[in-house]
Every structure is written in C-alpha cells, then in structure tokens.
C-alpha cells in the first residue's frame, strides 16, 4: 500500500518521506505487558533465520507495558517479518510523534493530525481512527478518536467505516506523548485460530506462544508435550504450528471440553497431530499410565469462572506431584497461575522442581504469572 509517512526520530522530531521514496524503517508493536522480551527474542530469531542483520529494539519506549519499538532494516521487509510474529497483537508504522501541552491536548491532537500527510488516505474509500490512552488525562480514548477522525475527514473527505475500513489510523496517547501510526493489522494477530467451539474464556495465542517459548522445546524426533488442562486446545494448536515433529497430547477433566477441542483440531486441520482424552490432571498416572513426556505446558484453572470450589494449596501440590511422575528425567513444566503465591509455596514445599523463570504477564485484565520449572531428577533415573 502506498503510504506517505513522517519518520519519527528518537528526539521526537519528524521527517517526511514521500510515497515514492523508501519508507522509514520504524515499527511500533504491541503485545501482552510482561512479554516484551519474548517479542524481542522472536523477532531477532526470525531475522537470523532470514539472513538479515539485527535491528535496534527498545522495550516499553513510552513507559507503559506491552510496547516494542523497532528501528532498522528495510521498512516493508521488516513489516512483513513483524506480521509473522506469534507473540504480538498489532503492528504499526509510525507516522508522527509529538508532545502534548498541559492544556488543550485534544485541540492540539486535532491540529497535528489535520496537517498530516498520509498517501493511503488519498485513495482510500473508507477509514477509521482507533486510540489507546495510557496515563492520567481529562479525556478518554473515544474523545481522541472523534477529534482525530474529524480532522482526517476534513483533510481528505474520506468516509468513515468503523467495521471494515480500507485504512486504519491509530492515535495513541502515552502520558504527555501522542503517537500517530498506520495500523497494518486490522485484527489482532493473537486471534489466529478459527474455532468451531469458542469458550467464554480462552488463553490468547500470544500467551500460549510465550509458555512454549519458556519451555525451550528442542528438536528431538521423539519429544512429547502434554497439556493436562487443554480446554479448547490453544496451547496444543500453537505447538502444532511451531513444532512439526513434536508429539502432542492433551487431556481435560470435562469430556464435553475434550470433544470441543477435537472439533477445533479438525477445523484447523491438525487433529492427526494430537491425542486428546478425558482425564483429571490430579491423576495423570491413571490417565497416561504408560507414557512420560519431555514437556508439560498448561494453563490450570484460575479459580474465578472455573475451579472456584478447589482448595488450591492441595490442588497445586497434587498437580506438581503428578507432573513430576509423568515427566521424563530432564523434563520441563511451564504453566501460568493466577494464585501464584499458593503455587510458589506448593512448588517449594514439594521440592520436585527447580524454578528457572518466573514472569508476570497481563492478560484479560488479570496479572497471572508464568512459571518455568525444571524437573529435579533422582539419582539413577532413566
């Protein structure tokens, strides 16, 4: 898409690049707060795989979580690579960045946006403005959208379409800074699995990727992965796309949920990659009596909509014990827990795992923790 942009330097000034010239090599990427370094690692790995040099990457450039700023490389190629990332939500090409005055911020935003040159707006039949606001202000994101949208309509005369626009302009406010961007992703990249069964609560695919990232999965042909709280199947589907040779197993205490996960797997074309069954994670020895796994990656109940009746101290203790028995020597357990203090206490008390990494992430307005644990093997095990 032809695009005239204002290249944003790190000192906040702008430099215009014409639609015929080379686009500036800057990207603004969003993810779950707490996963910024996961995005960085994935991007650098994809650049290495493509034979491209590393680029400058800044985490949380505006002081708020879930942000990654990228500079370097050829702009369109970098955008293509960014659009393939599995750990992110949206990709933006910055157009203009400016500081907001203490008074009259909305008017200032409207004035700045009205004179902004965006070649894509010249030919677009429809557009929309979206906004995210972080910090303390006397206005909301909807106010920003209305004022910026009115400015672009006056400038270009392009019709507004809030559902399916040709062009989406993002106007974000971070404290006293405003960033105007061209949004390359019309829907979140974390919403990549089309399901027949969509539960009310499902793990975001981006967070599933992060769990797999912390598992440090290798490339052995006989490696196996289990999700004993598989739900609708997000972790297994993510693993199926990333690791073509990994044998996948899933279980859930609810037979209906298992049936729905099978339907989802069929819809995604990966039913042949995984074995799903009904079973209680507190009794994995009975569910998988003859099988041990290299990795267990899972998302146990948080105790909000599901698992409200559980004694989580006993629950986590039993799950840790069963995971230890079902993991091979050298195995790894990665899970996300909302009641993280209880989980930490259970992990220390059982003494079956060594904590390798712990991370707070934001997902769905909650702040659970990812735990990556290595199995503590007994002498003489094989």
Name each model feature, range by range.
Residues 2-46, 50, 54, 58-67, ...:
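Class I S-adenosyl-L-methionine-dependent methyltransferase catalytic core
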Residues 105-115, 122-161, 169:
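Long recognition/docking surfaces used for binding and targeting
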Residues 62-120:
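Conserved AdoMet
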């Amino acid at each position: 898409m032809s695009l005239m942009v204002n290249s944003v330097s790190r000192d906040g000034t702008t430099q215009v690049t014409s639609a015929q010239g080379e686009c500036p090599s800057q990207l603004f990427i969003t993810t779950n707060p707490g996963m910024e370094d996961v995005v960085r690692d994935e991007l650098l790995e994809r650049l290495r795989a493509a034979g491209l040099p590393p680029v400058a990457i800044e985490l949380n450039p505006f002081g708020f979580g879930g942000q990654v700023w990228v500079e370097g490389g050829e702009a369109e190629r970098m955008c293509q690579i960014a659009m393939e990332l599995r750990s992110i939500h949206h990709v933006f090409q910055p157009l203009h960045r400016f500081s907001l005055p203490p008074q009259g911020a909305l008017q200032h935003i409207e004035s700045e946006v009205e004179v902004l040159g965006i070649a894509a707006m010249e030919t677009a039949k429809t557009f929309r403005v979206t906004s995210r606001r972080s910090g303390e202000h006397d206005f909301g994101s909807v106010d920003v959208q209305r004022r910026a949208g009115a400015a672009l309509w006056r400038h270009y005369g392009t019709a507004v379409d809030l559902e399916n626009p040709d062009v989406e302009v993002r106007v974000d406010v971070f404290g006293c800074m405003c960033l105007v961007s061209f949004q390359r992703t019309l829907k979140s990249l974390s919403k990549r699995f089309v399901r027949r069964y969509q539960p009310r609560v499902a793990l975001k695919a981006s967070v599933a990727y992060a769990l797999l990232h912390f598992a440090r999965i290798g490339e052995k042909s006989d490696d196996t992965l289990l999700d004993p709280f598989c739900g609708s199947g997000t972790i297994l589907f993510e693993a199926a796309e990333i690791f073509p040779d990994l044998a996948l197993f899933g279980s859930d205490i609810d037979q209906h949920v298992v049936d729905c996960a099978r339907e989802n797997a069929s819809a995604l074309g990966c039913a042949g990659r995984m074995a799903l069954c009904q079973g209680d994670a507190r009794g994995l020895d009975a569910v998988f009596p003859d099988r041990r796994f290299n990795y267990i990656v899972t998302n146990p109940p948080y105790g909000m909509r599901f698992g409200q009746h559980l004694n989580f101290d006993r629950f986590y203790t039993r799950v840790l014990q069963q995971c230890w028995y079902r993991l091979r020597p050298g195995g790894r357990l990665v899970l996300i827990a909302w009641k993280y203090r209880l989980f930490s206490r259970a992990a220390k008390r059982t003494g079956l795992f060594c904590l390798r990494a712990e991370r707070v992430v934001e997902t769905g307005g909650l702040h659970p923790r990812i735990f990556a644990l290595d199995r503590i093997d007994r002498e003489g095990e094989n």
